[in-house]
Amino acid sequence: MGGDTISIRSQSVIDAVPRIHLNRIERAVTRATTAMLEMQDPAGYWWAELESNVTITAEYIMLHRFLGLDESKVPRMMADILDKQLPNGGWSIWRGDGGEISTTVEAYLALKMAGLPAEDPRLLKAREFVLARGGALKTRVFTRIFLALFGQVSWDGIPLLPVEFMLLPPWSGLSIYEFSSWTRATVVPLMIIMAKRPVRPLPPEQGIPELFLSSDEPVFQHRVAWKGEASLLENLFVILDRILKLYAWMRLPWPRNFALRQAEKWILEHQEDSGDWAGIQLSLIHI
């Protein structure tokens, strides 16, 4: 690839970084460069295992359950998740983070689907981890979408991304082409899911009500909340979400059905030769 090379001791770098740190930075760059060169294959390329956090495995277990697929490999996936649990009961999203709530909730749900009882000591520690951080409603939107798919929270509380966005032209500034390519491959099928709101109920013993601070939370407090002390700009997304949900409540059939057909067409036209979309698991799960 082309481009200019900037010395770590160029004037622009010296001005931006305290001088006392330059030697440390230079040594770190040298070590990193040496390590990369040692890993290079004689043919000129690099190859290494692509690692991820346990959400990939947990979501794969959820996919098998939602679609009613063969679950014979689930025990092995369950063992892999348990092997990566931290001493504090949580699961990491990156090494050394001390555990992350969304990752932990997804792992917990997948383990219960796999048959681990709520009284298992490992799940008890995970429950303590989640409740100490505010409960399952403190998770990211993607995690709450998985919870909604299995009836653990209401779809009404999920921030809405209407499938009608498929109809917006690129010049509008709000079309799907404002997203990166891999995000589009995830968002387009996700908009179909949000329009259809499917739910595959779980047996009571596999649900996760114990991860909420209150039994009313999944229904009554699970929504995009207005922040009383925040500025109007900070609450703009709350306002937009409520407007979009009002529009969705009106259930206008023509634009909705046309947008669904356009989304389906987009998905079929953008499938890779390898059979996937954008080379990531999340887009495949949503599709």
Question: How should these model regions be labeled?
Answer:
Residues 1-286:
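Preference for long, amphipathic alpha-helical scaffolds in soluble/luminal domains
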